[in-house]
Curated annotation (Swiss-Prot):
Protein name: Putative BTB/POZ domain and WD-repeat protein R154
Domain BTB: 14-85
Keyword line: Repeat, WD repeat
Assigned protein family: Belongs to the mimivirus BTB/WD family.
Keyword Metal-binding: no
Keyword Lipoprotein part of the UniProt annotation: no
A molecular-function term among this protein's GO annotations: RNA binding
UniProt WD repeat ranges: 194-233, 354-398, 401-440
Amino acid sequence: MDNLKVLFEENLFSDLQLIVEDSNESIVLNVHRNILYFSCDFFKKLLIGQFSETNDKSIKIIVHNAKITSCVIKNFYGIDDKLPEYPDWMYYLETYRCYDYFGMKIPVDKLLELTVPSEGFELLLQIVDLLDYCDELGHLIIRNLPLDYDINDLSKDFVTDLQRLSNEYQIICTKHHTIKIFNNKLYKPIKTIHHSENITSLCYDNNNKRIIYGDLKGTIYAYDFFSNKIIFNLQNIQTNKTLPNNVIHLAIINDKLISVYFDGKITVRNSLDGTLCYVIKLIENPFLFKVCPHTNCIFHFNTHGFTNVWSIDTGNLIHKLSQFTNTMFNTLKNDLIIFWRENNLILCNYPSMDEIGTLCKEYSFPPLVLLNKQHILVGCHNGLMDIWNLKKLTLVKSTQLFDVPIISMTYSPNGDQLIVANCDREVRILNSDNYEIIYTKNINKDNNNKLLTISLHDAEKIEKLNIL
């Protein structure tokens, strides 16, 4: 390609003057017929077809954008001629429009990586309309949909399909050195992330659409879900050489990335770029902790009967509680906590810790709360799932899901489905309105018990599409 570049830049042996013209300007290029002929169907037909220009020394073509078209033609010679006055999204969309005009293949994988501002959304729709439509292109449209865009400008069938896509979610699980991503029908993995070390922790950053995972060496990786690239990685600075330094827990709360290490350290970072905000050094067992999105706090349970509570925003110690001393609890809202005492679930106010009531049944797994349904769900050793009324603290229903222990429960991003896994890695999807089983799937017995569901799109855009 370097030789071709020299031919163009030094105007060697050119045999055609090509005039590229749009409504604003004309650009003259000295080119070579054989180079154009072998580069795309448009010039192949123009140069040997039944056209009056076939033998002309000068040919004019009328295009939508002369500058972009000139860049595309220069690229036939291996010249990558970017236009600094064009933002990336506009440069690539205009380039892809030129590709279509020339009969060239539009690189869909590159198109799917684009983030387009509201002023470019109509152009994006035009480019997508040139392609064979697929779900990936529909997701691209939803991701770039301006919140002030009039949905009525789109066809009814197209909006219906976007609604379908907006309500899809994906399920993530880990297996030793890999992260497997399934669609919500749990067919074969649609994506697999391979890693050199055992993956020890996992969470999803919905704000930035990234999978965050940590490994045995204490390194944290931020993996962009749509571009399939590592955005950054963070090395752990080991403070205790006698202990392993692997990451045992990760969480995203608002714009903060919280990571807990085996060596007794909690770091809080900016989730966008990994910039360190502060470090909390735990005096004893780092496994006795809880990172809580409802209270925006970190709880640490020590062996002296106290629970320290830090603000995630400031890193300051804001409470010291003595009511409970184990991690088997969930915060239901910013003022409500459920925790274990003698195998019973106790509901209490936070931070006063005044008890509201007791769920009198032996449980050993953290409960799952569906606030929109006002239900508390608890999985049992015998495969039974109990559903409690959050306000009345009465048992609504018990349903036998499996014959073996339930190890994890989560729900879909919009709350309409419940995903429950047992120790044999059999997963069942339930309707969260009536708790009836929709379907069952096995996703490999040697996956660990980390199960996440992720929404592919922002809640505001999902609501906008489904409000019609």
